[in-house]
Every structure is written in C-alpha cells, then in structure tokens.
Design a protein with these regions (language model features):
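Flexible, polar/acidic helix-loop-strand segments at domain edges
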Residues: 61, 157-237
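C-terminal solvent-exposed extensions
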Residues: 28-40, 44-60, 66-69, 80, ...
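Second-shell loop/turn segments in exported
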Residues: 77-82, 121-131, 144-150, 200-206, ...
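N-terminal post-signal-peptidase region of extra-cytosolic proteins
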Residues: 51-59, 72-80, 86-91, 123-141, ...
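C-terminal motif of bacterial Sec signal peptides marking the signal peptidase cleavage site
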Residues: 17-18
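Positively charged n-region of N-terminal signal peptides that target proteins for export
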Residues: 1-4
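Extracytoplasmic
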Residues: 65-68, 85-90, 99-107, 119, ...
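Hydrophobic helical h-region of N-terminal Sec-dependent signal peptides
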Residues: 6-14
C-alpha cells in the first residue's frame, strides 16, 4: 500500500512539474517578433493556438459578497466562441447587488501591462489575443489591484444585435459623424446598423473612443430605462454572443440589482489615460477610489 502511495505521489509531482514547465516556457526572439508584427496588422489570428492560454479559476479572486466586479471587453474576434481578437474597449464594472449602484471605469487599451511569460510589456488590448478576457482581467488586477472576479467579452458585431433588441441607443453625433451616418448632428437614436457604422468611423487618433462611448451609452441607458422582464429576454439573446465566467445565478443577481429596485439606480462612469503608456501606482489609487470610494 505504501509503495502504491509513493508511486502516486511521484507521478503527481512529475505531472505538476510538467505543467509548471509548460507554464514557464518562454518565447524565442523570432517567435515574439512575429507575434508583435501580426498584432499590429489586420491578421485575425496573430497568436499561434499553441500559445493561447485557457482560463483558469485561480487567475481571479473570489467574488466579494454583495458585489460583482466585472471586466467587460468588446473584441474584434470574428467568432466569440474562440474569443482571441484584439480588444476594442475595456471597461471595469462594479455593481452593488443590494442597491444596484454601478460604477463603470474605462481603461486605456494602449496601456502597457505585463503578460506572463512574455519577454516585454504589451498593450492591454492585445492580451485578449493570448488568453481571452480571463487573462486580460488577471493582467488588469496585477496592474491596478481592482479585485475583478468576473469577465464578459462580446464581439462588436454581435453587440449590435443587442442595440437592436434595446430599440436603439442614443448617441451625441458631431457634424462629421452625422454626415457619415446620414443623420443630423446632436443627440440621435441609432439602430444596430447605424451603431456598427458609428464605431467603424475611425480616423487617425480616434483609437477606440467610439467603441467605448457606445458601450457606455448602452450600459447607462439599459440601467436607467430597462425592466426585469425585458432584461431577462435580453439575457437570453445575449448569452450565445458572449464569453463569460458569470453563472446563471450571477446574471439573475445582476438583473435584479439593476432592474428590481423601486427607484432608479446610480450609474457613474469615468475614464483615464495612461501617461507614457504606464499603469502606475497613482492610476491604481485613482481607479480604486472611483470604484470603491465611499463604501
């Protein structure tokens, strides 16, 4: 019996050491340079499949009682089931499940973060290519210590279905944007097709400003004007379009928190830019103060 136990222990140690070796496997200079070049191009799959990490529950902390800290990503992935596209927008959403109070923090996609095993920091928007929204949430936690426990990724074209399901979204259009969309300047209600055209109106320097603006507007307008019945129907439509670690119970809790209140919920949004591309201690403190301040 002792011999069998000893053999099992040895095998387990060998297996664990093998996993550790795989986890710590580095990149050759040529591999890394090829990936960096592909990330900067329009290649749909810049990271080799053998280098993509699958989500592990140990990457993220357990959820804080009474709250959900959710990383929300919009991706350019053509197939959300694979979810390894570049991130168009990265938002942290903290919801109080008792009051429905929600705070939405927009993160700079071009900020540099440390990726496990990588030889150098990379832009936050590229982390999704290596390990989806789960790995992105892990890197954000490492950089800013925000206690993100959940993630949700949606490709932007699928997100447009949500816009139509909501009956459109109101956006403030500049004269140039309005002309491109065959609409009038100012506040306009956009349908899904118009919203997709809106986010694709990119000029040098625009980055992903419109994607962030659209996501924030949809979340705000949904929280302010939705109903529980409508949101349950929307959740049924949304789930096939997303990659998430939210459970059914989590989703029910969120819907009840946001739409089951007897009064309108508080919804605040904030964004910041990273000086020289660095998420430093000052930005980490500001982010935590915004998400957790006053609690």
């Amino acid at each position: 019996m002792k011999r069998w136990l000893a053999m099992i222990c040895v095998l387990c140690c060998l297996a664990l050491s093998g996993c550790a070796g795989a986890e710590q496997k580095g990149w050759t200079q040529e591999e890394w340079e090829n990936v960096i070049m592909a990330l900067a191009s329009d290649d749909e799959e810049p990271v080799p499949e053998s280098r993509r990490a699958s989500f592990r529950s140990g990457w993220l902390p357990s959820a804080e009682k009474g709250f959900i800290n959710l990383l929300l990503i919009s991706s350019d992935a053509p197939d959300i089931d694979r979810n390894f596209g570049r991130a168009d927008a990265i938002l942290v959403c903290r919801t109080n499940l008792w009051t429905g109070e929600t705070r939405l923090l927009s993160l700079p996609e071009d900020a540099l973060v440390t990726l496990p095993e990588a030889p150098e920091p990379i832009a936050l928007r590229y982390v999704n290519c290596f390990g989806g929204a789960g790995l992105t949430a892990r890197c954000v936690n490492d950089a800013l210590n925000l206690g993100i426990s959940h993630f949700c990724a949606v490709n932007i074209e699928a997100f447009i279905e949500i816009v139509d399901a909501l009956g459109g979204v109101t956006m403030e259009l500049t004269e140039g944007e309005a002309q491109a969309l065959d609409a009038a300047p100012g506040a306009q209600r956009l349908n899904g097709d118009q919203a997709l055209r809106y986010v694709k109106l990119r000029r040098p320097g625009d980055g992903s400003i419109r994607v962030r603006a659209l996501l924030t507007a949809v979340l705000r307008q949904t929280a302010e004007g939705g109903s529980m019945k409508r949101m349950v129907s929307l959740a049924d439509l949304l789930l096939p379009c997303v990659d998430t670690n939210l459970t059914t119970d989590d989703i029910v809790d969120l819907i009840f928190a946001l739409f089951g209140q007897s009064r309108p919920v508080s919804f605040d949004a904030m964004g910041f830019s990273a000086k020289d591309g660095v998420l430093n201690a000052e930005l980490a403190a500001q982010s935590r103060e915004f998400l957790y301040g006053g609690e």
